[in-house]
């Protein structure tokens, strides 16, 4: 599971080592992992070696009525107004295809308003075309918004433009490409420093 591997990586724990309750496992790192797939979440929850530190929740992130109470409650548990970092891995395309240009912008605005740092792995445009082809081969209709998307082409550049120009974030680093030819982009909230614990009041203009 990516979430467990990420937790181990952030704490420098070797594969297969212990649990969250063991000394040295890291007392201040807690992850909240969300996915729309309830079965996937249940499987991850039942197999997690760090149940005290990694929380799993089934969530449609585009459902504001569901996300607000869940995320606010999680932050209150730790007396925080925002997440230190958000990881958005291979998600942007699905948000974009199912909710259109406005949905993608709203999604990025929401993440920017709630995260001090944000690591994004945008799927390139060729993945959009491949997803549409797979759907057609299955005899199903195109994604509702695929043919009407005005945000297209170099998706890493377009997402960077949205976050930096409209959502009060700075691009800190591009970590190159993954084995799937996807960029890893790290953004930081403008004007924030590690000592700042005040609420973030930001979003896309």
Model-predicted segments: where are they?
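Conserved SAM-binding strand-loop segment of SAM-dependent methyltransferases
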Residues: 50-70
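Conserved SAM-binding loop
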Residues: 44-45
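A conserved beta-strand element that flanks and buttresses the S-adenosyl-L-methionine
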Residues: 87
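Conserved SAM-binding motif I beta-strand of class I
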Residues: 30-35
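Conserved SAM-binding loop of SAM-dependent methyltransferases across substrates and taxa
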Residues: 1-26
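Conserved Class I S-adenosyl-L-methionine
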Residues: 109, 131-177, 185
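Conserved beta-strand signature within the Rossmann-like core of class I S-adenosyl-L-methionine
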Residues: 108-129
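A short, conserved alpha-helix within the catalytic core of class I
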Residues: 67-72, 94-110, 114
């Amino acid at each position: 599971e990516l979430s467990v591997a990420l937790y181990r990586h952030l704490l420098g724990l070797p594969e297969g080592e212990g649990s969250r309750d063991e000394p040295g496992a890291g007392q201040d790192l807690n992850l909240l992992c969300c996915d729309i797939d309830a079965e996937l979440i249940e499987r991850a929850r039942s197999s997690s070696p760090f149940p005290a530190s990694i929380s799993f929740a089934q969530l449609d992130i585009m459902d504001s009525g569901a996300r607000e109470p869940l995320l606010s409650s999680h932050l209150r548990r730790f007396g925080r107004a925002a997440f230190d970092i958000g990881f958005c891995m291979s998600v942007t395309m699905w948000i974009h295809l199912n909710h259109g240009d406005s949905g993608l912008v709203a999604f990025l605005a929401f993440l920017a308003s709630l995260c001090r740092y944000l690591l994004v792995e945008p799927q390139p445009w060729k993945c959009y075309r491949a997803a549409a082809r797979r759907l057609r081969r299955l005899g199903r209709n195109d994604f509702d918004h695929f043919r009407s998307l005005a945000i297209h082409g170099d998706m890493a550049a377009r997402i960077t433009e949205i976050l930096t120009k409209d959502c009060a974030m700075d691009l800190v680093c591009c970590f190159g490409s993954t084995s799937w030819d996807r960029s890893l982009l790290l953004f930081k909230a403008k004007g924030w420093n590690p000592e700042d614990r005040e609420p973030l009041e930001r979003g896309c203009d």
